[in-house]
């Protein structure tokens, strides 16, 4: 699809969890028509990541580092952090996350407070999904300020309502 967009001179956004083949991800990220890369990081802590996603974050972090190793790719990246109260919003974990982002010279992060919009759909198809809470407004602001001040990042907070 990205190649078809390129033929029509349409820019594309690469939206990734980072969990995939490094060479394929780099190949897509290098394309001139890919002007934005949305890279989701659920947790930099491998134990937390495994507990809530079922897989290690090692490949995801490796792919993030690979993308960040090239300045022209790194400039396209906006990190997205889904935040769940008492799961991945503790300040120690936020500090570790910000340190990683700063070390990779990343400039933008979007904080995505948890929402339960998918729970009804899961129930309708016979599935179950654990219910979580989103962090408080005050805590979201504290996290955003930490990223701004420590990592010197541009921060967006989406889905507050």
State what each model feature region is.
Residues 85-161:
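Auxiliary Fe-S-binding modules of radical SAM enzymes
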């Amino acid at each position: 699809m990205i190649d078809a967009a390129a033929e029509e001179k349409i820019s594309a956004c690469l939206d990734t969890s980072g969990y995939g083949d490094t060479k394929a991800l780099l190949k897509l990220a290098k394309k001139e028509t890919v002007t934005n890369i949305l890279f989701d990081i659920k947790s930099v802590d491998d134990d937390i990541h495994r507990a809530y996603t079922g897989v290690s974050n090692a490949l995801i972090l490796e792919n993030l580092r690979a993308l960040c190793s090239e300045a022209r790719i790194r400039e396209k990246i906006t990190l997205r952090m889904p935040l769940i109260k008492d799961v991945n919003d503790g300040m120690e974990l936020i500090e570790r996350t910000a340190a990683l982002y700063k070390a990779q010279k990343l400039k933008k992060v979007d904080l995505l407070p948890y929402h339960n919009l998918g729970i009804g759909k899961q129930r309708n198809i016979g599935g179950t999904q654990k219910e979580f809470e989103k962090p408080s407004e005050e805590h979201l602001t504290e996290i955003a300020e930490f990223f701004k001040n420590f990592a010197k990042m541009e921060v967006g907070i989406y889905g507050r309502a």
